[in-house]
Amino acid sequence: MMKKFTCFLLCATILCAIFCVSVAEKFHKMKSDIERDETPMECVENGGFCPDPEKMGDWCCGRCIRNECRNG
């Protein structure tokens, strides 16, 4: 009886660890998606003004980044 209980506890621990890792990966992905919210945005037109100058800078050359441009 004790062997079965020990085996059950071991299996439950392994399943719990797998579940916790899965949840942690989902939260990490959600966190990185939220942090990625500041990623450069496409300009309306290359070499034109950014759609949101306060957030992305005054001038675009491919992709808008805060106060600088990057060709993309």
UniProtKB/Swiss-Prot annotation:
This is U1-sicaritoxin-Sdo1a. Its main location: secreted. Residues 25-41 form a propeptide. It comes from the Eukaryota. Disulfide bonds join C43-C61, C50-C64, C60-C69. Residues 1-24 form the signal peptide. One of its GO terms (cellular component) is extracellular region. Keywords: Disulfide bond, Knottin, Secreted, Signal. It is found in: Secreted. Expressed by the venom gland. The lineage of its organism: Eukaryota, Metazoa, Ecdysozoa, Arthropoda, Chelicerata. The presence of a 'disulfide through disulfide knot' structurally defines this protein as a knottin.
